[in-house]
Amino acid sequence: MKKTLKIIGILFLILMGLGSLTKAIVKPVAADSLEEQIRRANRDCPIPVANGVGQVSSISLEDGFIVYKLDYKPEYINIDVYRNNPEATRDMFYLAFLCVNGQGGHSDMMSNELIKRGLGLRIVASNGVSSFTSELSPTYIKEMQNRINVNPTKALHDALKLKFETENCTFPIKIDEGMILKGLGLEDNNIIVEVGIDENLYDVASFAAVSDEFADNIITEANNGDPELGALLDLCKISHTGLTYRLIGNYSKNHYDMNISSSLIRQNRNVPPQVNIH
């Protein structure tokens, strides 16, 4: 099942990029200009994730926008999904910005700085074959700041919901013999991975016997360098969520949940240093 989860995606990388710049702005060196703060953040680039599957390639100031350039290997991101859902994608980026902006007691410091200077955010994502651009104008940032008032964890959970709603159009996908990835979602404090099971090949109830071993194996494979699982567990850690594989029988519709608790993930994964979320 592990090999199917290509959800490294936009959200995690933009959290890392935003986190890098937020640190530079809220902890500036004396007499630093904003331009110098951006240059300092850019010196951390490229910021890789998941063994180089994706990266924040650069952070720069161009034409009144702070520009984040994100690059992925082609098979790890479906550019069309985001290009075809521009408003949801922009809102997801804003919620990620709100999450990072609210960390460490910094409140609205970064958004206020952007509004004061009349600057927006621009995200340019590429998979080496095609690309798309999403812009958060100063007007949009100010409107959203006036309309949305949530804590960082709630902002990130809302961003996750938007992410999954946007990307679920790519499912179902066959992931193994007798297994189909049906979709991703957020339920309570767990990321849910729905997997359809062919009951001619598997007894859904039999998975209960290997539940603990399954959780340990997922953690071990992630820590041994599996890019997809590593990114997925890191996303769970920074969003304070657990991970649930929901196995659903294709005939009976009975299901069994294979759970990896948030506490287990947090004990075994480190928060990426660019993301100031604990």
Model-derived features with residue positions:
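N-proximal, solvent-exposed amphipathic alpha-helical segments enriched in charged/polar residues
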Residues: 24-65, 73-77, 147-187, 200
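Short glycine-rich, low-complexity/disordered patches
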Residues: 48-60, 99-128, 173-185, 224-251
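Positively charged n-region of N-terminal signal peptides that target proteins for export
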Residues: 1-4
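C-terminal partner/receptor-binding element of secreted or periplasmic proteins
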Residues: 117-154, 240-278
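Hydrophobic membrane-insertion alpha-helices, especially the h-region
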Residues: 7-23
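Mature extracytoplasmic domains of secretory-pathway proteins
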Residues: 60-110, 182-235
